[in-house]
Amino acid sequence: MKKFTITLALSILAVLLVATPCNAKGKAKHVVLIGLDGWGAYSVPKADIPTIKQLMADGAYTLEKRSALPSSSAINWASMFMGAGPELHGYTQWGSKTPELPSRELNQHGIFPTIFQLLRDAQPEAEIGCLYEWDGIKYLVDTLSLSHYAQAPDYNKHPEALCTMAETYIKKKQPALLAVCFDNPDHVGHQAGHNTPEYYAKLKELDT
């Protein structure tokens, strides 16, 4: 997971698809944000991902979004959760657990503001969760703002574990906001190569 090659803004795609327009009569009660580490926009046209492509057709997306630099994991996950680049949040390394540079702003928990904390401030009783494969995620999400967070156990041997966890949590708690963060296709990309048959097989698996 040394590179975070998502140039595709599908980590926020779920938010864009689930959320309704600001002037709509009703607003979304539940938002699920799904992130796939190492997913390059170049793969979308030839990838066998009918579910995702249908979501794209029905919602909003971009294939032009670039990674924050340097293009590695903690920096980019932080940038998405915090809505700011590394020059503001201060996370500058692949496995950053705390900012290498002083954050320009700190919330009440001593971390750069996140989408999770903003929702917590607005809705103190909201159920807010984050489920992930890569353990580094927990350092970037302001866990004090979360109702629940957990890592999928032994996920390389049990790739279905995170999906099972998310399904159980959604059915039981019906969270207002949930982030589900996959380590793949990045892990496969490092092992077998990006833009390889193995890489596209993993994308197809994740689409289902």
Place the predicted regions along the sequence by residue.
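Bacterial Sec-dependent N-terminal signal peptides
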Residues: 1-27
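Active-site nucleophile/metal-coordination loop of metallo-enzymes that catalyze phosphate/sulfate
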Residues: 25-28, 40-123
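A long, amphipathic alpha-helix that forms part
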Residues: 26, 160-164, 178, 186-208
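Structural recognition of the beta-strand scaffold that forms the well-ordered cores
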Residues: 31-35, 62-66, 79-81, 118, ...
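Second-shell loop/turn segments in exported
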Residues: 38-43, 66-67, 100-107, 117, ...
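Extracytoplasmic/secreted cell-surface and envelope-processing proteins
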Residues: 42-45, 138-142, 187-192
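Catalytic-site neighborhoods of secreted/periplasmic enzymes
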Residues: 89-92, 107-158
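Generic hydrophobic alpha-helical segments
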Residues: 115, 162-167
